[in-house]
C-alpha cells in the first residue's frame, strides 16, 4: 500500500502544505475536522486582520490563483476564507485530497510505544498510525510523514488564577463565550458583559462592545499596568489603533466601560439568568453581576494528539523546544520581526513529525501566516531529495 503525507488541518498553513506536496509530486491527504476549510478563520470572520493581503497569501497560492487580491488592504477573516482559501481548496491539485468531518484523534508509531527505539532507524522508518473520527465511525490511516497544522483557536485557555479553571467555570462552560463576539448582533450583547483578557482579541472585543449603546463592559485585565502590546513606530495601523483605543478606555473615555487592572477571576456562580463573578483586585475583593462572560485569554494547541510521540516541548510556552528557544532568544515581541527559525528548529525528536503554523508557537502570540508559509518552504527544501521515503516509507 502506498502511504501518504498526512496534513492535519485545512486552514491556511495546511492548505499551503497541500499545495507544496502537490507541487513536489508527493501523495498526501488533508484531514479536516470541520465540514469546510478555514473553520477557525470563519469563527472570527467579522474581524479584520492587521496584516495586508500581501502578507497573507503564499507564493504557491499566488502562482495558482493570480487574481487573488494584492496590496495593503487588510481582509477580514471571512474574506480571507472565501476569496483565498475556498478557491485554493477547489483547485484540481487538491481534488479528492481533503477529508472533511474527519478529526485525527491520536497519532502513534505503528508497533512502537513512546519510549521505544529512541533515535534509531527502526523508529524513523516505522509508519505513523492515525486514529480518525469520521462520519462513519472510527478508522485507522497510515502515513510516513505528518504535518500538524491544526492551529489553536479551538482550544481556549481558562479563566482562573495561574491558568486553571476558576471555581464554577466548568459548570458554566456553556454560558461563557470564548471567541470574538460579533457585535453586529447588538441585541445579543445587551446588558453587562464581563470581558477577560488583554491581548488583541480582548482589545478588539472591548472596542466593539464599547460601541453598543445597550451594553456595559466590565473589563478584567491581569496586569496592573498593561502596555497593551504597543510596538514603537508601529507600521500596522490597525494594531496601533487598538492600542490607542485600549489606553483611552482604561483612562475612562467611555462611561459604559470599566477597566479593572491588576485583577483576576476567583470564582463564578449562577445567579438566576445572570452570572456572579468574584474578582480579586488590588483594592480587595470585588463582585460583579453580569449577563454575559467573554473569555479571551488566549489559545493553545492540542498536545494530546501526539502524546505517544517523542515531542520535546518547551516547559514555558508549550511549543516545540527548539522553536521556542529560537523565538524567546530573538529581540522584541513584534510579529513582523520574528526570525525564520529554520528546519532544524522545526524538527522534533520524533522523525518526520512536524508541528507547523500557529500551533508551533505555543503560547507565544507573535505568529504570522507569512511565518507559516516560510515553514512550509523549509520543510519542502529539507525533503526535496527524499521522494523514496515519502512513497515507500524506506
Please report, for each region that a protein language model flagged, where it lies by residue.
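A conserved FAD-binding loop/helix module that cradles the flavin
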Residues: 341-393
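N-terminal Rossmann-like FAD-binding beta1-loop-alpha1 element of flavoenzymes
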Residues: 3-30, 195-198, 202-212
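Conserved Rossmann-like nucleotide-cofactor binding loop
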Residues: 13, 36, 153, 201, ...
Amino acid at each position: 500500500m502506498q502511504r501518504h503525507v498526512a496534513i492535519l488541518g485545512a486552514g491556511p498553513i495546511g492548505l499551503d502544505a497541500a499545495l507544496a506536496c502537490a507541487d513536489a509530486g508527493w501523495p498526501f491527504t488533508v484531514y479536516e475536522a470541520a465540514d469546510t476549510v478555514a473553520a477557525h478563520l470563519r469563527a472570527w470572520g467579522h474581524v479584520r486582520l492587521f496584516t495586508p493581503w500581501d502578507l497573507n497569501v503564499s507564493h504557491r497560492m499566488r502562482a495558482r490563483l493570480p487574481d487573488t487580491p494584492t496590496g495593503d488592504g487588510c481582509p477580514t477573516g471571512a474574506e480571507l476564507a472565501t476569496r483565498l482559501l475556498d478557491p485554493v481548496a477547489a483547485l484540481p491539485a487538491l481534488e479528492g485530497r481533503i477529508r472533511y468531518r474527519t478529526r485525527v484523534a491520536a497519532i502513534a508509531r505503528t508497533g512502537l510505544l513512546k519510549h521505544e527505539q529512541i533515535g534509531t532507524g527502526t523508529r524513523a522508518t516505522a509508519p505513523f498510525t492515525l486514529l480518525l473520527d469520521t462520519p462513519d465511525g472510527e478508522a485507522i490511516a497510515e502515513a510516513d510523514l505528518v504535518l500538524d497544522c491544526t492551529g489553536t483557536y479551538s482550544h481556549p485557555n481558562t479563566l482562573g488564577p495561574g491558568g486553571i479553571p476558576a471555581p464554577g467555570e466548568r459548570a458554566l462552560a456553556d454560558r461563557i463565550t470564548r471567541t470574538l463576539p460579533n457585535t453586529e448582533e447588538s441585541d445579543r450583547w445587551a446588558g453587562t458583559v464581563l470581558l477577560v483578557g488583554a491581548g488583541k482579541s480582548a482589545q478588539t472585543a472591548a472596542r466593539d462592545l464599547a460601541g453598543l449603546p445597550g451594553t456595559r463592559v466590565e473589563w478584567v485585565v491581569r496586569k496592573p499596568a498593561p502596555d497593551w502590546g504597543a510596538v514603537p513606530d508601529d507600521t500596522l495601523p490597525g494594531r496601533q489603533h487598538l492600542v490607542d483605543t485600549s489606553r483611552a478606555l482604561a483612562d475612562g473615555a467611555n462611561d459604559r466601560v470599566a477597566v479593572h487592572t491588576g485583577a483576576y477571576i476567583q470564582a463564578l456562580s449562577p445567579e438566576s439568568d445572570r452570572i456572579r463573578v468574584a474578582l480579586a483586585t488590588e483594592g480587595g475583593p470585588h463582585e460583579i453581576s453580569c449577563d454575559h462572560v467573554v473569555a479571551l485569554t488566549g489559545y493553545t494547541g492540542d498536545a494530546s494528539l501526539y502524546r505517544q510521540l517523542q515531542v520535546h516541548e518547551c516547559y514555558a510556552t508549550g511549543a516545540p523546544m527548539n522553536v521556542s528557544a529560537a523565538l524567546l532568544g530573538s529581540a522584541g515581541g513584534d510579529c513582523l520581526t520574528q526570525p525564520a527559525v529554520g528546519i532544524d528548529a522545526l524538527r522534533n525528536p520524533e522523525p518526520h513529525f512536524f508541528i507547523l503554523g500557529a500551533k508551533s508557537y505555543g503560547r507565544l502570540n507573535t505568529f504570522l501566516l507569512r511565518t507559516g508559509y516560510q515553514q512550509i518552504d523549509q520543510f519542502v527544501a529539507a525533503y526535496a531529495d527524499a521522494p523514496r521515503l515519502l512513497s515507500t516509507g524506506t
